[in-house]
Amino acid sequence: MKNTCVKFFVALLLFALPVAAFAQNTFKVTGKVYDAQTHEPIIGAGVMMKASNIGTITDLDGNYEITVNDTKGILVVSAIGYEPMEMLIGKKAVINFPLVQDVESLEDAVVVGYGTQKKATITGSLTTANMTDVAKSTAPTLSNALGGVVPGIISRQRSGEPGNDAAVLQIRGVGTWVNSSPLVLVDGIERSLNYVNPEEIESFSVLKDASATAVYGMRGANGVILITTKKGKAGKVKVTFRTEATNLHGLRFPEYIEGYEFANLMNEACTVSGVALPWTDEQIEKFRDGSDPYLYPNVDWTNEVLKKDAFQTTNTLSVTGGNETVRYYVSLGYMSTSGLWKEDPSFGYSTNARSQRYNFRSNVDINLHKNFSISLGLAEIVRENDFPGYGAQDIFFQLKRVSPIAYPIENPDGSFGGATTSYLNVSPYVMVTNGGFIKYTHTSTQATFGAKWDLGDLITPGLQLEGNYSFDHNYNHNVVRRKDPLIKQYVGDDPVTGEGRYNLVREETAMGYSWGADSNRAYYLDLRLNYNRTFNEHTVGAMFMFNRREYINYAAGNSTAALPYRRQGIAGRITYNYAQRYLFDVNFGYNGSENFAKGQRYGFFPAVSAGWVPSEEKWWNVNWFNHLKIRGSYGMVGNDSIGSDRFGYLSTVNKAAAGYLYGQSQSVINGMAEDQIGADNLSWEVARKTDVGIDMEFANRIVRISADYFYEYRDKILLQRAAMPDIFGAAWEQTPYANIGIMTNQGVDGQIEITNTTKKGFYYSIRGNFTYAKNTIVEDDTAKPAEPYMDTRGNVAGLPLGYVALGLFQSQDEIDNSPKQELGTYTVGDIKYKDLNGDGYINSNDRTFIGYPRHPLFMYGFGFTFGYKGFDLSLNFTGAGLTSILIDAESMWPFSLDYPAYNVMREYYDNRFVPGAADNSKAKYPVVHAGTSSNNYQISTQYLRNASYLKLKTAEFGYNFQPKVINKLKIESLRLFLNGNNLLCFDGIKLVDPESDHLGSSSYPTQRGITVGLQVGF
């Protein structure tokens, strides 16, 4: 018995030893799990000790506490939508986990046309933008932040003027002449892209092929952009405030020559033309030394009207929270961007440009029943744009018209200088500072109501009924307060009285007042039936819907334009996949538009797509190759954007045509005549699109690659008939429209991303994307030209027709031994052209299509992000290629059109052909003439430049304060950052921004922005 008791206690002791040992070696680890970018806490994240059953989850503040027993153990943290992260426990009592968002995880739901799908099962071509990268751009309009960020999007910012700085966007290039802009939907409703505050955006999808856009039918040919705004999430109330202060520095102002150089150039022109010189050396010296600034002025007009720096501020306050029943998201935003125009401080009003935007958005979701929920979205956008009394284009035109010696800013008597020549009578300075101001106000009220009814319990699992209704009201109001100060032309002092002599140019007028207003409304309704269900390894889905949109312009100028614009139709989708291995989709849209005649209003647009995922096959055992999907699609989509003219199938009558004199009073009685000739068979464009793509993920999904080849054949493009015989008997503008245009468009796009977080918490992301899209004209109804190289067919749309320049004539012998140029008189130093048809003469038959189109055929972007212990650095580059720009004619033709009035740019002066110079072989511009030189005033490769560029578009360095600091401050997150926008540009132009419309002096400069910002969460 005694031995038995001893054995029992020994056994009990041996059993207890491991337990005691565990108890003695256990210790607690605490910490916080938060978003690496926003520093907001992550609720419900799983925290596990690797290779054990020890685990916990984070609370509402993202905090966790776990008891572990091994300093060599590894903690693994995972959360939905984030990449998992591991850290060695060691002897640390506090371990924080900054999780990185899992960009487009295969299990994530991606927004598609009228629904969502798992990324793993998508067979169409679509891309989602990383809004974290987009938000790093301080551009005041969203469209300017997209180029080089999203594959498939080609963008160009034509101007930097506040309020008029939106970029032109195309998806996969240009496939039509009429309207190549994509359809933009915000929360499923057709709304403006540039009025959305980027901080309000939850997801941004770009639909590119027919499979992705077929449900939009005759609106889907140009691609679709889907923006989904943020919604509330269950949890405690979160308040986020973000503020930015930006210094904007103007880039590449137009640079003109000084007064004495202008006078010298006038003398040089007269020497070349063999006429008397207008200026003596003594007079030229007065322009240089400023000894007589009224009769011999030297005005730098650019410096007088443009300042170097401006200011921008952006602020957003958002509140989100709720529970399982009610969830809400509310956001308030304010943005203000000032312009670069100088002002007269003596006025009580501003003449500078300024753009202000006020944003309010509220999204509320309510679960009324476990199977029934409703949503209400409200938004109010107010945008105020202020400009000088004269528009920017007029001001920049005047900058190149008024020379530095034309007249002084002010005359001796204090009046403003001017000239009696009509287009020179007002100076750029007066236009900017003393011409009054214009104020535009746009107000948009948006309301969206939605309801979802889960019919799973009532009919069958996976069935859902959904409906949406929206109402948008837009109101525009403008006020014009123009004024004209007293303007005189000073012609010197009276030799007898000594008083100044003047020619009156313009009397002073009081500030005027005029205003205008217009408004419009849009209604949208849709009703959808959704079905999604999995049977073992078979997953099927379906969607069928009806939608209708009506738009009314309440300020229409005539009864036709006042009629409502209506579109309606049905759309559907069927999806099937087997074990996420074999994928198949069918999409269609059947839409109608009242733009066309009865019998022509409705069209059917189907598309099919399929995919195969070899990495899901049982025989796939390539561990480092995590995912491979091959997909393809083919379908038809349409474009019913036929311009501003409505009802092109109807003929119109001009009631104010030429008439006759009637009666004794000889009153004019107007006649009636046929006006626009209608065509009752008009229809929409049809684009037949093919897409083949591949998606890959490697190295534990650290590396992601996707690429697509696309081809589009678009016919029935609406064009006004051009090749009409004279016997037709009507003016060109009366000729009917017809669906006769044909264009093809093909190319490739793709992206790569390498993202990882090391065990020590170092985060890095390397990414790149590209888009190449080239169109070809097949038919545009133009007449067959005299020479085959002048035919538009077979060329890219948008190419300029011009001469091929062979440089400048260097000698008379070269002129004598060259083909005769019939474009005007020419001499040594003038442009030499190529004789394309070899007939010995240079004339209009020697023109061909030159360069590349203004929109780039190739666009790309790449970037880097690094983060460690709260610090992060992000760089994003954007580039474009295969694009050309023509030098603005009036900027580069010296004394353009009217010697000697027009200004002369520094670029021309420093690179011109100089008579008598030792070497003119490197001269880029022709010799100057005292008068017009039509030989040189031709569109040619001499004035064509390569507009390719690479920009450091954004750079941001930031610090997210660590949990122990923000806990002391009793806040959830705190981030400080320094941001740069448009920091560097590598290109061969240097005169203007390479994205501008013209290479010269008529574009408002873009700006470099340096921003200091703060984001705090409560």
Where are these regions (language model features)?
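Glycine-rich, aromatic-lined ligand/substrate-binding cores of catalytic
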Residues: 854-886
